Design a protein with these regions (language model features):
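Acidic, metal/ion-coordinating pockets
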Residues: 12-184, 188
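Sec-dependent N-terminal signal peptides of Gram-positive bacterial secreted proteins and lipoproteins
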Residues: 1-8
Length: 192
């Protein structure tokens, strides 16, 4: 799985009056969209977010990965239904988990395009260009605060997904990487 880290920026970045910010998150949903116990459906998540908003609260809804694969709901259409549900639920941000790559690299990129919310990952790198495939960070200005989310896609994706999806098969070489060597000094790992 992957994670998104929310952290308030320094107090110098606060703007005007500050209020509490509620961060709702999902992780490792694995397409269990009709889970009855506890009743955690996308409709229930959307209702929870809306109830905070109706009460005048600042709220963000984020997902830390592994949402498009796991049951027949995902495999029937390679996760398209899940992205539609997440769009309807009002997600603000997501980061790809290792299972977002289970339907292939082209599908992983298509999922991101289908989403009405941005994806972030600081360590999904295109080795042909040396650049990140996605933005590393997303800033939100809510509740008088500047809040940053940094996406990290688990480096174990190569062993938990299909390594061939990260390769140029015609040249038998990797063209994508999920290690953190591209973003930090070797003595300062960002992922533990």
């Amino acid at each position: 799985a992957s994670m998104a880290i929310g952290a308030p920026a320094a107090s110098a970045c606060w703007y005007g009056d500050k209020s509490d910010v509620t961060i709702l998150y999902t992780n490792d949903v694995h397409t269990y969209i009709d889970k009855q116990s506890p009743k955690l459906t996308y409709a229930a998540i959307a209702d929870l977010k809306q109830s905070y908003q109706n009460a005048g609260k600042d709220v963000l809804l984020v997902d830390a990965g592994d949402h498009i694969q796991g049951t027949a709901y995902g495999s029937m259409d390679d996760g398209a239904t899940i992205i539609e549900l997440m769009n309807e639920a009002g997600y603000d941000l997501a980061t790809p988990g290792n299972h977002e790559f289970d339907y292939g690299m082209a599908r992983a990129k298509a999922v991101i395009q289908e989403a009405d919310f941005p994806y972030v990952s600081c360590n999904w790198v295109d080795l042909r260009t040396g650049f990140n495939v996605l933005p590393s960070v997303k800033f939100f200005f809510v509740g008088g605060r500047k809040i940053a989310f940094v996406g990290v896609t688990t480096p174990e994706t190569f062993t938990k997904s299909t390594p061939a999806y990260f390769m140029d098969k015609s040249q038998s070489r990797y063209i994508y990487d999920l290690s953190l060597i591209h973003i930090s000094e070797p003595t300062r790992p960002l992922y533990i």
